[in-house]
Design a protein with these regions (language model features):
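FIC/Doc superfamily catalytic core
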Residues: 1-341
């Protein structure tokens, strides 16, 4: 039965997205979606915490791709598995196979700056469908995703969309927020216009979520810098802040190894940062304490997002500027390492 269904799907005539009839409503949805992509891409391109953001956004993107493969796995489960951190009151993921096996390679690929033409990366022979020459670039990208999804039953097709968008010129670099799709593309269930509309809506919502994550991360960076600038004896708080940008989940033992201090001293340092609202303890009733940054805690649903009007950013000062510059130099060094692979 499975073979016959597959044969029916592969041989059924399908109208490509690039040839669907346009309505004013669909044009408006496409315009809003392209604007959302452009806004996120512009912010990420100019942000000094782009690499740190990619790590955080990759949890959500990978979780989306897993759910499209019918895994009942949420972002917090991806985070827990990748950092080796059991989340209190949350059962471990029970699933067959190795759902996280492709994550590391995918994350590395998000930093790929090779200039391959997008057609060279497709695992199938591509022929331009009807309406291709006059279609907007985003519609072309979704058309490729549509074709790809029926030729590749693995998670790779959903994870490949960020790089495809970058190679087609939609974004300056692969954005993990664009790891998405729709199972209906494989089964051809439902009207094609409805499938396209769902994809456009998902892209817009993911980009808006990506901007919110970036806002929280940049605010966390400013708040941490303000705390350090206001301390008479900051000690290794600054080093902890730099570490947390790329490793948002930390323990006293891990900090001890990375910063060259005693476990006891690292525990006190983390407790000090937690008292100032920069970290939250998530270890529960265990013999070792684990902390994550407050902005990551909000993204994972461990912490509630603050309500009301956000507080004003700390006023400029020489001390604050010096700390922010040090953070930025650290991120630039990390970016160079990632580019080298």
């Amino acid at each position: 039965m499975r073979v016959s269904v597959y044969y029916w799907v592969m041989t059924r005539p399908v109208r490509p997205f690039t040839a669907l009839p346009w309505t004013s409503d669909l044009v408006a949805v496409l315009g809003d979606t392209m604007a959302a992509i452009g806004a996120l891409d512009a912010r990420i391109s100019a942000s000094s915490v782009a690499s740190a953001w990619r790590i955080r956004a990759s949890w959500a993107g990978y979780a989306t791709a897993l759910r499209l493969q019918r895994f009942e796995i949420d972002e917090i489960d991806v985070f827990s598995a990748l950092v080796g951190l059991p989340i209190p009151h949350r059962p471990p993921v029970a699933t067959m196979g190795e759902p996280f096996a492709t994550y590391s390679g995918w994350l590395r690929s998000l930093g790929d700056r090779s200039e391959h033409h997008w057609r060279e990366t497709l695992p199938f022979s591509f022929e331009e469908p009807e309406g291709w020459s006059s279609a907007p670039t985003l519609l072309r990208a979704l058309g490729v995703l549509d074709l790809w999804s029926r030729r590749d039953a693995t998670i790779n097709v959903w994870l490949a969309f960020p790089a495809l968008c970058a190679r087609m010129g939609l974004t300056s670099s692969p954005l993990p927020s664009l790891a998405l799709g729709d199972p209906a593309l494989r089964t051809l269930h439902g009207p094609r216009v409805a499938q396209l509309r769902r994809l456009l809506k998902t892209i817009r919502e993911n980009c808006e979520d990506g901007l919110a994550r970036l806002d929280r991360l940049e605010k966390w960076r400013r708040d941490f810098a303000a705390v350090i600038a206001g301390e008479l004896r900051p000690g290794q708080l600054e080093d902890l802040g730099k570490l947390a940008l790329t490793t948002p989940a930390v323990s006293a033992r891990g900090v001890s190894n990375r910063l060259g201090m005693t476990v006891s001293g690292a525990g006190k340092l983390l407790a000090r940062a937690a008292e100032r609202g920069l970290f939250v303890e998530v270890s529960g009733r265990t013999s070792w304490r684990v902390y994550i940054t407050s902005e990551a805690g909000i993204a994972l649903g461990i912490l509630a997002a603050p309500r009301g009007r956000p507080p004003s950013p700390p006023p400029p000062s020489p001390g604050l500027d010096a700390v922010l510059c040090a953070f930025d130099r650290e991120m630039e060094a990390i970016d160079r390492l990632l580019e080298k692979g």
